[in-house]
Amino acid sequence: MALSQMATGLLLASTIFCLILWVVKAWQPRLPKGLKSPPGPWGWPLLGNVLTLGKSPHLALSRLSQRYGDVLQIRIGSTPVLVLSGLDTIRQALVRQGDDFKGRPDLYSLSLITDSQSMSFSPDSGPVWAAGRRLAQNALNTFSIASDPASSCSCYLEEHVSKEAEALLSRLQEQMAEVGRFDPYNQVLLSVANVIGAMCFGHHFSQRSEEMLPLLMSSSDFVETVSSGNPLDFFPILQYMPNSALQRFKNFNQTFVQSLQKIVQEHYQDFDERSVQDITGALLKHNEKSSRASDGHIPQEKIVNLINDIFGAGFDTVTTAISWSLMYLVANPEIQRQIQKELDTVIGRARQPRLSDRPQLPLMEAFILEIFRHTSFVPFTIPHSTTKDTTLKGFYIPKECCVFINQWQVNHDQQVWGDPFAFRPERFLTADGTTINKTLSEKVMLFGMGKRRCIGEVLAKWEIFLFLAILLQRLEFSVPAGVKVDLTPIYGLTMKHTRCEHVQARPRFSIK
């Protein structure tokens, strides 16, 4: 009897073992001869490596890359995820093999953005997507970096930022006069929203504050939900459970798109193709010209989606960069003084800084680069996916594989930066301190690269420079003695700092 029970137990154990082995083998893709799967850590059944990611996936995956290399694979739930680190490896994938890695995964959170019709977030990577991207890029350039013949400014962007920076200066000084301190984030957000609003719609959001500004100020729900590694995207059951953040995210998307639809409809009613004043008008004009063509017409809802993408390209990244910059300036007053000395020497105090001053302000440029690198406030690009079976660095990567691009790791790679956790803007200067080290500056990664590179990159860099130059020329920023600025990032699609309500600003000179 005992022998029979032992035999039965051994048979059962053997059966279970064989079943587990079969499941593991079935889980693994069949590899072409001579290739291997990317290495990676062992994961728990059903959970995969989700517990390893924790609250800071960029840090966890950077540590894993030190062990497994620049091409590694994890599982979140039952979904395999390729994680790419290292600048050369990422450039190989996104640039040299750009067509293979230009897709977007079909993730739940991304599908909620304009019903999977967003140029930036949707899985589409075909000819229609490419045409929409070109159209959006051209429209953005026309009303940002192109010159306005009727203005003394070098381009539309400079004109808008110069006006908004003056308004921001006034608001900050009013806050100082009233309460003696302020939280700069919402004030910066309003100014940046007004710049992109002027380019997209021809007006400032102050005219529609009841509709749009509270919505924009709640955009933190957006960047939290679409962050890389969100369990919501990999465990479908979570989509049906009570989730206040998810509901706020859905409400944000729905309300924001409805607001854009209203603005586009108003443009359509008043549209005159002989007098195009903004990006929305340019897209409507494109439709008027191509309405008789079979392949050029864009439905009105598609125009709303393009405007949504363009607005996003020029809003959140700029707001976050300027806000982080102010936090670092009050935490590093000596660096602030050095930048202001450079501004006084090159520009003086009789006129506003202009975009043409950039080459003569290397320390300002170095500071912005170091903000991009040190904060790495866009820790991952929006997730990519493979469009076909491919290989990378000798590893087999199947079609439709979800791919995380770890920009934080690139910006904190000790082999590249030596002391990656030190904040040193001067690292980007040449030996004589007069110019930017171009080779090193090109190793900073914040806007992605390749076919999915952010269409607003140039716009964002120019806008960040001009806002900061104007603010620092006129104001000295500080916090009261004893107030400690918390520079610990809060994880999301774009990482924010803890809000500080104790920032102060003192005029550096009087305006006559």
From Swiss-Prot:
Belongs to the cytochrome P450 family. PANTHER family: CYTOCHROME P450 1A, STEROID 17-ALPHA-HYDROXYLASE/17,20 LYASE. Glycans are attached at residue 65. Induction: By polychlorinated biphenyl (PCB) in liver and kidney. It comes from the Eukaryota. The keyword Repressor does not apply. GO terms for cellular component: endoplasmic reticulum membrane; intracellular membrane-bounded organelle. InterPro entries: Cyt_P450, Cyt_P450_CS, Cyt_P450_E_grp-I, Cyt_P450_E_grp-I_CYP1, Cyt_P450_sf. Heme binds at residue 454. Substrate binds at residue 222. Gene3D superfamilies: Cytochrome P450. It comes from Canis lupus familiaris (Dog). It is a peripheral membrane protein. This is Cytochrome P450 1A2. GO terms for biological process: arachidonate metabolic process; cholesterol metabolic process; estrogen metabolic process; retinol metabolic process. Its cofactor is heme. The gene is CYP1A2. A cytochrome P450 monooxygenase involved in the metabolism of various endogenous substrates, including fatty acids, steroid hormones and vitamins. Mechanistically, uses molecular oxygen inserting one oxygen atom into a substrate, and reducing the second into a water molecule, with two electrons provided by NADPH via cytochrome P450 reductase (NADPH--hemoprotein reductase). Catalyzes the hydroxylation of carbon-hydrogen bonds. Exhibits high catalytic activity for the formation of hydroxyestrogens from estrone (E1) and 17beta-estradiol (E2), namely 2-hydroxy E1 and E2. Its main location: endoplasmic reticulum. Constitutively expressed in liver. It catalyses: an organic molecule + reduced [NADPH--hemoprotein reductase] + O2 = an alcohol + oxidized [NADPH--hemoprotein reductase] + H2O + H(+); 17beta-estradiol + reduced [NADPH--hemoprotein reductase] + O2 = 2-hydroxy-17beta-estradiol + oxidized [NADPH--hemoprotein reductase] + H2O + H(+); 17beta-estradiol + reduced [NADPH--hemoprotein reductase] + O2 = 4-hydroxy-17beta-estradiol + oxidized [NADPH--hemoprotein reductase] + H2O + H(+); estrone + reduced [NADPH--hemoprotein reductase] + O2 = 2-hydroxyestrone + oxidized [NADPH--hemoprotein reductase] + H2O + H(+). Disulfide bonds: none annotated. It is found in: Endoplasmic reticulum membrane; Microsome membrane. PROSITE patterns: CYTOCHROME_P450. Keywords: Endoplasmic reticulum, Fatty acid metabolism, Glycoprotein, Heme, Iron, Lipid metabolism, Lyase, Membrane, Metal-binding, Microsome, Monooxygenase, Oxidoreductase, Steroid metabolism, Sterol metabolism.
